[in-house]
Amino acid sequence: MYIRRSSRTHKGKTYTNYVLVESVLTPKGPRQKNICSLGDLQPRPRAEWLALAHKLTSALSGQAELLASQTPDSELQELVAKVQSARPLSSTEDSARRVAAESDLVAVHVDQVRTEESREAGPVHVGYQFWLRLGLDGILAQAGLSERVRQLTCVMTLNRLIHPASELAMPDWIRSTALADILQIDFRLLAEDALYRNLDKLHTQRVAIETALAERERTLFSLDQTVFLYDVTSTFFEGLALSNPKAKRGYSRDHRPDCKQVLIGLAVNRDGFPLAHEVFAGNRHDSTTLDEMLTALDTRVGLLPGQTVVVDRGMSGEENLKKIVARKLHYLVAEPYGARSDWVRDFENDEDFSEVKRETSPTNPFQRKSTIRVKVRQVGEETHVLCLSSERMAKDRAIREAHEKRLLVDLEKLTKRVAKGKGRGTKPAEVLESIGRLKERYSRVARYYRMEYDSQTKVFSYSLDEAKRVKAEKLDGSYLLKTDRGDLTADEAWRIYTLLTKAEAAFRTLKSPLGERPIFHHKEGRVEAHIFLCVLSYHLLISIEKTLLNAGVHTSWATVRETLKTHQINTIVLPADGGMVLRLRQGTAPEAAHRDLYQKLRITSEIIRPHKTWSTAEEASK
């Protein structure tokens, strides 16, 4: 530091002022920074000005030694007080004072330094930051849930996101992570009963929470609300679930017809964000759930005239289409496979087909996309889109040939059994029952085989209807879309329909990575709360992946989670002189891969602020 003299003249009078100046190094080179105005000081030789500046520097840095000078000590003290009142302490001075006050500058027994209580921190840190970004704590508070319920809902949701476990195992997982450090909550006494009770409290407010969350995500990510994608899946129970009236046996997408199940209906937008979900009885047909879901959507996000509902062929019946139109909405659906028979000639005719231009995946630029060709046919006010897929053609042919091969084997077995005329399954009623089962089991190919049984002669025979098989071969790789929107080209209609994979991807994620199935709860409310908890965790997951996608990063949450598992929190134990032990609780230094992900996700890499604790060696040993 040094003292600079400045003068200015006003109305014929000259005013002199002395300023304490510090030289600082900036990216553009050394610069002078005014620290404080010292006022009008006594005139003195230049050497004494330098000595005074040195004394001020020494006094401000806390040094006791002062240089001898003609300047009175009272003047120095006055100048020090003036400078201190005019500026905050520098980081160096502040650090020096803290060191002096807390005696952190200590001698450490290096051979006794150790780390303890290491906890996985990276994934829970990201999950909690997105919990805050989505404003979930405030949303739960607006729903009337207490602070304790909000805290437990947070950790239960993060468990589903990171390492799904039952409520019985969840407390141990929570204690194995850095959640206690991040949330500043003691989970040492947390038991599963508290988590079960929390599900009961959460269940009553799920509609209000889902409504507020959908609006928050819409504004946060600028989401499109013109297209709704709806699909249904099933999830099965372990046990009989006698106390749940919705637990029924039905068509199982999980290939568990032996278990009771419930149906889950989920509506998402074109970016894959959930808008509404409902839980239905396990024996209901998909088509019977659409009207209830439209009502739920109207409650959660509000339906507006002109929006488009996209559903798969299982819900594309005329009754459902009338319900969609009655709400002044548009529809885009896949027609049942049987409807293709009316369009065989159009599928055979290559004219008017145009190829859909498909971009390669950023994560796999060398992947070969299947060829998709589409064309439009107008029937009244409806637009029919005929689609041909090269990949699906090969798949359909392989499935059909495999089914036909197995059907022929079973037909030969039935023929031999009937010809033998003895034993089980040879009575006329039993033979007819066997024929019915074969037609049901091999419905894809049985329709072009004639199966006949003469109860008088007790002869069973079958024959191939070649015309029907040729017709089926011509439809390999084809499917049919239908919409009441006249403004869509064939290409646009196909692209909107394929967005339905967003709902299918959500179901796959809910069932496996987020641990939605199987369900061990039996009470209806807890089952629905369990499913809602999985949906909440999916909100976090899709928000994380959407943020990365917006940053140009095409990766999954599973990859992010595995990468960040090595970012931890631990306690460094530093035995010091005098029988004292310093414990420093802090996060490990993030690696380059960690910092890159945190930057892309726009969250801090500092998980917690370092926390220091002093204790005696005797206390530390306990």
Regions found by a protein language model. Name each.
Residues 2-5, 15-17, 27, 91-97, ...:
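Anion-binding and metal-coordination hotspots
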Residues 44, 59-63, 86, 173, ...:
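Conserved, well-folded catalytic cores of nucleic-acid-processing
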Residues 25-27, 45, 51-52, 59, ...:
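Acidic, glycine-enriched active-site microenvironments
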